[in-house]
Amino acid sequence: MKDKIIVKGAKVHNLKNVSLEIPRDKLIVFTGLSGSGKSSLAFDTIYAEGQRRYVESLSSYARQFLGQMDKPDVESIEGLSPAISIDQKTTSRNPRSTVGTVTEIYDYLRLLYARVGVPHCPKCGKEITQQSVDQIVDQIMELPERSKIMILAPIIRGRKGTHEKVLENIKKQGFVRARIDGEIYDLTEDEIKLEKNIKHNIEAVVDRIIVKDGIEGRLTDSIETSLKMAEGLVLVNIIGEEDRLYSEHFACADCGISIDELAPRMFSFNSPFGKCERCDGLGTLMEIDEDLVVPNKDLSIRGGAISTWGDSRMKEESWTYCVLKALMEKYNFDLDTPYKDLPKKVQEVLMYGEPEKLKVTYTKENVTAVYNHSFEGEINNLRRRYMETNSDTMKAEIEKYMSDNPCPKCKGARLKPEALAVTVGGKNIFEFTSMAIREELDFINSINFSEKDKIISSQIIKEIQSRLSFLINVGLDYLDLARKAGTLSGGEAQRIRLATQIGSQLMGVLYILDEPSIGLHQRDNDRLISTLKQLRDVGNTLIVVEHDEDTMREADYIVDIGPGAGEHGGKIVASGTLDEIMSNENSLTGKYLTGAKKVELPEERRKGNGNFITVKGAKENNLKNVTAKFPLGTLTMVTGVSGSGKSTLVNEILYKGLNKIVNKAKDLPGKFKEITGYENIDKIIDIDQSPIGRTPRSNPATYTGTFDIIRELFSQTQEAKMRGYKPGRFSFNVKGGRCEACSGDGIIKIEMQFLSDVYVPCEVCKGKRYNRETLEVKYKGKNIADVLNMTVEEALEFFENIPRIKNKLQTLMDVGLGYIRLGQPSTQLSGGEAQRIKLAYELSKRSTGKTLYILDEPTTGLHIHDVNRLVKILQRLVDGGNTVIVIEHNLDMIKCADYIVDLGPEGGDKGGTIIATGTPEKIAGAKESYTGKYLKKYL
């Protein structure tokens, strides 16, 4: 019993009463077509139950913070361990999260810098030493004669609590006053009640002195008292100046600057003791961006160059026009000159204002008057309104014209100057985290510590080294620890969490992973597989939902789920070792593994239509002044190892650059010199894996526009006409036809305190979303709720005589989505499914033959059989004269390209150049190309 996990009667989603035995402490791959039920079995059944049982064992107090898991629809699961899921969805979007903080390496670094860091003066850069009482007295005596000062002992600094004992203690030592959170209190008279959950500063007032000759003795006593009370610190409050902090520990004798005792919190950009005060520790500031305020500098002011000004402002009777008239008289320009040709001074005044008051003549209701007006400029105006408004809508509106820029104070380093002045091995903590991970490991290994520092740091260094090594082993050596977590791809984020788990060295755990090979080049795949085996060998069970052939060949056990997708899936087709799967007649996966089935090579490679889109001088992120040519009328793949610059070139520069030129979009592209050849395309479409909608109200029928036609069809029925129902009656988003008890959701959310929220079908409409009257209207015997509950395949048969609906549904069938329901909430669709719905929507439109489609790893989540289908669809788009550019690692996909742009040679700093371009055959012959090396086997 102990060596197996036994699942009996799983019925979650489309699973058909599945029973299964899988070995423990092995590497198990779940595979099958997209939508066959792999995730339902791995995540929604096995993981959900493992997690639920663990959480159930905790107290109800702890459970309210964790959220209770629902019990999955399964009869029983035996042999379960506590389960940890490592999926793609849980990347932190918090701008404060970095690779360093997510992997916890940054915590060890803070400790390292606090314990063995060498402090320097932030002003002059000299190494800082401790200050004696005499030095402190001498510096105070240099203040102007008759300066009023207060000597304070900083006892509590930024700590939560009521601190009653501390205040009592100060009183007992004979002090009558204390400064609490910046205010002076009389300890004998005032009743002081401090808020328990707020951080406080408490300083005892030791002495109040006027600086003059002869006070040195008294000053020395007061400073010694303060140093004793506040563990080596004294705070001098000078009337009309900033407080000065002196320390018998660290201070610069030349500049008179003291810094706090080194502590880990000083290096945290989330702590008030470490973060840069200007940007609040984010490293960037949102600023109004002139390129967003004036996106098209070829336009004139009258023609709409300043995008924040509507047409009404250009009417001659408007106030803005009268102000502009006064500016025109002063600077001699007109409103019809293209913005780029206006003198620099005029552009500056329009954006940042006119220092002198203008005489503005303005007529309102036949009364003309002359006003003295200060013109503040459009950028200053937006900035002021942003600071003053309390309206979230107004803020969101103005944020459209803002972009993130490095903070001018910390230059993006996020920390205070004092923290950045501390070095280990000659580098400060920001310089260290900005290096690529492989360089960081080399640097850590090369530091020469003194004997004392070696003893202090040995344990910390060991932890940092092992964690950096794990990141390198999962193929992330090109990242840096300062990289924001929100900018990572799903695959990168998942592999970081994988590295963190290996670092935790747990055993006896059930790990469930969702396609860890996503975004990984074949070259790095071997390292990933050995990492997975390492996790298994420690004594863990790994269930990996995966389509990657290499991973399957290395697995101990494979479970093939199918045979089809959706309604046609949900059964175990085959399970066993690699050989057993390959010899199983029923297994589609087995047929591809043996080579009986494969993705066929195209009969010929297209040459394109002779036109190119060329990106010149691309320099964003790690791109090294790259010039890339993309032939139009072809299927082009952009390849290269992880971190080589593919996404930067295609998404940040090509897509955003063209989007700005062709669609006048506001998104700022990355750095490049120019893009040529764009006149040969009329549309640019990015088909990504983002959800088709954020709420359960959006679904495949609404996204593809099918639902509008279906509602129209229902409103044309005899019954609907008699009742006077229009198409709006059949919408679940507006009042009229929908069930008002659940507002057309079909379910009602019941909030539970200690348990997870419960969703129950609406009692009134029984989950059908519509009221009784609406459901009485039928088309071919089915009401609108029945239609929404049909799969695409069923609906195609049902509506075969309605060409407008049939065409849209046929494209959904073509992309392999016959199994999804028309009304399936978008929140229940995977990224791959969302992407294919978008593809189907594009296929159903009339092609202009001049569209450029961009896809980023469309094979994510696709079984090799689905990849075969996808290739055919993309070829169909190109056959219509369009151009498709795909970022891809899947070699079955790459071999079908007409043209390849291969980036490399490595990731990060060692990447960012074009290694080879041309047909797959040409790439396979390129010596430098890693892609070519692996592609040879597929051609």
Curated annotation (Swiss-Prot):
Q: Where are the zinc fingers (C4-type)?
A: 252-279, 739-765
Keywords in UniProt for this one?
ATP-binding, Cytoplasm, DNA damage, DNA excision, DNA repair, DNA-binding, Excision nuclease, Metal-binding, Nucleotide-binding, Repeat, SOS response, Zinc, Zinc-finger
- Superkingdom, natural source: Bacteria
Q: What does this protein do?
A: The UvrABC repair system catalyzes the recognition and processing of DNA lesions. UvrA is an ATPase and a DNA-binding protein. A damage recognition complex composed of 2 UvrA and 2 UvrB subunits scans DNA for abnormalities. When the presence of a lesion has been verified by UvrB, the UvrA molecules dissociate.
Select a single GO molecular function from the record's annotations and give it.
zinc ion binding
Annotated ABC transporter domain residues: 309-588, 608-936
Subunit structure, per the record?
Answer: Forms a heterotetramer with UvrB during the search for lesions.
Among the GO biological process terms of this entry, one is: SOS response
Keyword hit for RNA-binding: no
Spell out the subcellular localization from the entry: Cytoplasm
Any one GO CC term of this protein is: excinuclease repair complex
Q: By which gene is this protein encoded? A: uvrA
Please spell out the taxonomic lineage of the organism that makes this protein.
Bacteria, Bacillati, Bacillota, Clostridia, Eubacteriales
Family to which this protein belongs: Belongs to the ABC transporter superfamily. UvrA family.
Identify the PROSITE patterns for this entry.
ABC_TRANSPORTER_1, ABC_TRANSPORTER_2
> Zinc: is it a keyword of this entry?
yes
* Positions with a binding annotation for ATP: 32-39, 640-647
Protein name, as recorded? UvrABC system protein A
